[in-house]
Amino acid sequence: MKKKIIAICIGVILIVGMIITYIVLKPSTEETNLTKINLAEVTHSAFYAPLYVAIEDGYLEEEGIEVELILTPGADKVAAAVLSGDLEIGFAGTESAIYVYDGGEEDYLVTFAGLTKRDGQFIIGKEKDFDWSSLEGKEVLVGRKGGMPALNFLNALKNAGIDASKVNINYSIDFASLSGAYIGGTGDFVNLFEPNATLLEKEEYGYVVASIGELSGEMPYTAFYARK
């Protein structure tokens, strides 16, 4: 009788162990049904908060999508990563997709959704007092020539009635290095997204003096694209 009870106990333990192992190792239905997408993100900024909320709060998973963000500084590099097939989706300025199309690429990039419709850059200066004419004769760090931040800054200058030829626009510093260059003493003004703009002011390297988006108006500033 004692041997029988021991055998039953061992059997129960084995069954319970098998059930636990099955539950732990079996992928959930939700996991197996998710389509994983690698998304090239041009920069990480509070400006893109809706995207982060959609990922963290599970809104994309509800649609069957699992997104992994890959920081890829520079819209040109985002476009290259998508064209090469290294990443499925690009998230950057729409100008990068236009350049690819104009270049005659057969499998060009197609923009299928937008996130931001206004420039999120702020101008940082060394003095609190500012009007747009303050930029005349001064060096302004704007990032890569032909990039959306630089193009939109030119648009803001035009809308402010400022002749761009009277502003020393520095295109030589890549977008990801703008804060460091300005802290290091390059330029009189620099155009930055948040949180970098506020951080520079907090660390007393300058003052947030103007919003570029306020003057440049609405436009498809940052969007999602994939190969045709």
Q: Model-flagged regions — what are they?
A:
Residues 32-175, 181-184, 188-195, 205-212, ...:
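Short, glycine-/small- and polar/acidic-enriched structural segments
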Residues 1-27:
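Secretory targeting signatures
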Residues 200:
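Short helix- or helix-capping micro-motifs
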Residues 223-228:
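Extracytoplasmic/periplasmic substrate-recognition and gating elements
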